[in-house]
Amino acid sequence: MTNNQKVKTLTYSAFMTAFIIILGFLPGIPIGFIPVPIILQNMGIMMAGGLLGPKYGTISVGAFLALALIGLPVLTGGNGGAASFLGPSGGYRIAWLFTPFLIGFFLKKLKITTSQNWFGELIIVLLFGVIFVDFVGAIWLSFQSNIPLLTSLISNLVFIPGDCIKAILTVVIVRRLRKQGGFELYFRK
């Protein structure tokens, strides 16, 4: 990687971290029957893997989560600190760390970023940005809130329609940005 590419990578990674933080300024929508709101930050998490690939997408999200963990109010609703990782939403946040890696890895492995296969990219984003995150989040919610696992899984179905819309928007935006150039570096072998 040349010095110019290193600077570009650092800039893109910092921008992605900032973008995820900005999405947290938009208030969450409380659902009522479970203590986890509908938020937009997960869209930024999905975008990190699709734009920056497995390595730099994970670094970007890891930086965001580290800022949240040390107490900066970067999570939706101005939350931060270790308690926000131990509460009802903790499982989703833990899954977020793995999401850009999984999305980026499979996009790279299947060479979907260089093809016109937007549907294949959508399937990968749905699998790892929606189903994986909601599944891990539901398991955590079950244990943390003492809710039966089946009840927790069923209650998470409320997130699926909105998360699917966010996944579609993510694929459309990411493919458009990738078409502009500069991101192909992150999907080379």
UniProtKB/Swiss-Prot annotation:
It holds the Pfam family BioY. The chain crosses the membrane at residues 19-39, 57-77, 85-105, 123-143, 154-174. It is found in: Cell membrane. GO terms for molecular function: biotin transmembrane transporter activity. It is a multi-pass membrane protein. GO terms for cellular component: plasma membrane. Keywords: Cell membrane, Membrane, Transmembrane, Transmembrane helix, Transport. Its main location: membrane. PANTHER family: BIOTIN TRANSPORTER BIOY, BIOTIN TRANSPORTER BIOY-RELATED. Belongs to the BioY family. In E.coli forms a stable energy-coupling factor (ECF) transporter complex composed of 2 membrane-embedded substrate-binding protein (S component), 2 ATP-binding proteins (A and A' components) and 2 transmembrane proteins (T component), probably with a stoichiometry of 2:1:1:2. May be able to interact with more than 1 S component at a time. Probably a biotin-binding protein that interacts with the energy-coupling factor (ECF) ABC-transporter complex. Unlike classic ABC transporters this ECF transporter provides the energy necessary to transport a number of different substrates. The substrates themselves are bound by transmembrane, not extracytoplasmic soluble proteins. This is Biotin transporter BioY.
